[in-house]
Structures are given as C-alpha cells and as structure tokens.
Amino acid sequence: MATESILITTLPMDFNSQMNNVTIGLNDNETLCENWREIHHLVFHLANACFAAGLVIPSTLNLHMIFLRGMLCLGCTFFIIWAVLFRCALDIMIWNATFLIINFMHFVYLVYKKRPIKVKNDLKDIYHRMFEPLHVSPELFNRLTGQFCEMKTLAKGQTYAVEDKTSVDDRLSLLLMGIMKVSYRGHFLHTISANAYIDSPEFRSTEMNRGETFQVTITADENCVFLCWSRERLTYFLESEPFLYEIFKYLIGKDITTKLYSLNDPTLGKKKKLDTQPSLCSQLSVMEMRNSLASTSDHEDGLQNFLRGTSTTSSQRHNQQEFYNAYGVGPLSHAVFC
C-alpha cells in the first residue's frame, strides 16, 4: 500500500483527474467506463448516416457507384464541419479532407463516363438499324467509325470494284445511301441496298486466303455514300474488342446469307428484307459466294435461265437445289448454315 501511494502522488494532476472516471477492476463483471461522455453533435451523426446510406445502396441500381461516391463525399464534408467547428481537431479535418478529394475526383469521373454520347447524324441510321439492337454502345460505335474509317462517295456509273483487277485485301465497306449492282461477266447478279456490306463475301473469304481479287464487278446504280475501313487496321481493332469482333462476325454472316438468297431471287435486293437470316459457314470462297451460278453452265443461255427462274413451285425448288449444289453444300438442308 505504501508503494501504491507513492506512485499516485508522483503522477501529474491532469492524469489524476482523469483517473477519477476510471475504476480498475479485478473482476470481469466490473466496467471500464464509469461516466460516459456526452453525445456528439448532430453533424457527427449526419456524417455517419451518409456513410451508412452509401454502403446500403444496392449494386443492381444502374447509378449505384455514383450515389455511393456522392454519399461518401457528403459524409466527409460533415466530418470536416464537425472537426473544425465543434472539436477543433486538426487531424480529423486533414484525414477527411483527403478522403473528400479522392471521392470527389472519382465521383466526377463516373459522372463523365455516364454523359450522353452522340452518334454523328450521318451514321445514326446505320447505328440504330444494325448496331444498337445488338447492344453496341454509342461510345464503342464511335470508336469503330472514328479512328480508321472514311466516308466516301461514288457517282452513278462509277465502279467500286472490277472483276479480276481490284484486290480484296485492302478494305471493307458498308453502304449508307444509294444502290449498287453486282455483275459477273456482264450478267446482273443482285443489288446492294443501303445498310448492307458491299464486299462481305470477299472479306470472309480473305480471312483464309489472301491475295485474291474481286470475281465480280460492283457498280453504283445511283449516287452512293459508304463507310470504308482499312482491312488491316480494322482487324487489329477487332482483336482488341472481342465483343465487337463477334458482332462483326454475325453481321457479315447475315449479310452474306442475304446475298445468297438474292442470287437465287434477284428481286430480293430491292423488294424484300431478310432481317433474321442465320449466318453462313465461313468455308465458302468468293467464287462460290457470288459466281457459282455462272459455274453451273458456260453458256449464256444456261446462266440466264438460272437467274431468271420460273413461277411454278417445282421449278423454284429445282433452281433452289441447283443453287445450293453450285455452292458445293450438297442437299438442301438447314445444316449448311452456322
């Protein structure tokens, strides 16, 4: 006891006054705090309420990250007010000011990412028709059409490609406005309307075989406007965007299928639309895609008869089967499509 009294008398007066509120107990049932301090100011509780509200925002909400950062910013602001006006605590103010700056910068970044992105007026129609239904974002579409894509025009009568002369390795084009006609050795095959790829069969074919030339002639039937991608740069871009790569595979396959049907029915290009055709297997070459009809007969009469077709059901079925046989896919069945 004498030792304990000596220790207490040597302690500072401030410490002795604080010890009055504390009882050091030997039993587990005794409490450490005898007298609790008063409740903090309302601003302190508002800060914690903001933190709690931000943490319980469901992640399924579209803007949940923006709301979370906003509530954290508000909570840090209340803590700074409480530390400056009611506690005079410099350390609390500095820490919360740091947290406020970090959260506010992230908040601004998230709001910037959510800004409405506009598609160019010239490309709105092609975006809404082809890419938006496949959930391609405007931001990704603008990247696709802005970096290595040019908008070009062709006057009526000008040629986009000449058979056996124009290389197929350089570009891929998408027709925005106008009509083009495709012919083989002077024989009309089909038309290409707006919102369709101009050279999709050649693009698919050159994935396997490079150095080929167009086997058909493509001519503007009226004034045309089209998007033109550099083949090499487009390939590199799609390799870095797997989602967009799959979208391109689907759209090109669908476009090739439409062209196949229009070969068998030349009126299809102008009067009908195939909106839900399946994609075609990539093994078909350019010659098989557009010129197989000519390979069925070396005579002009045979080609003309095949292209012309008849109105009877039996002749239509015969021409359709001959069409698929010319492509080298055997009996007519759904198994030929991917």
Swiss-Prot record:
A GO molecular-function annotation: cAMP binding
Gene Ontology biological-process entries: epithelial cell-cell adhesion; heart development; positive regulation of locomotion; positive regulation of receptor recycling; regulation of cell shape; regulation of GTPase activity; regulation of membrane potential; skeletal muscle tissue development
The keyword Transmembrane appears for this protein: yes
Coiled-coil stretches: none
Positions of glycan attachment: 21, 29
Membrane topology reported for the UniProt record: Multi-pass membrane protein
UniProt cross-references to Pfam families, sorted A to Z: POPDC1-3
Keywords of this entry: Cell adhesion, Cell junction, Cell membrane, Developmental protein, Glycoprotein, Membrane, Tight junction, Transmembrane, Transmembrane helix
Domain of life, per lineage: Eukaryota
GO cellular component: bicellular tight junction; lateral plasma membrane; membrane; plasma membrane; sarcolemma
Main location group: membrane
Spans traversing the lipid bilayer: 41-61, 66-86, 92-112
Cytoplasmic side, ranges: 62-65, 113-338
UniProt record similarity statement: Belongs to the popeye family.
Function recorded in the entry: Cell adhesion molecule involved in the establishment and/or maintenance of cell integrity. Plays a role in vamp3-mediated vesicular transport and recycling of different receptor molecules. May be involved in the formation and regulation of the tight junction (TJ) paracellular permeability barrier in epithelial cells. May induce primordial adhesive contact and aggregation of epithelial cells in a Ca(2+)-independent manner. May be involved in epithelial movement during corneal sheet formation and regeneration.
Identification of the protein by name: Popeye domain-containing protein 1-B
Gene source species: Xenopus laevis
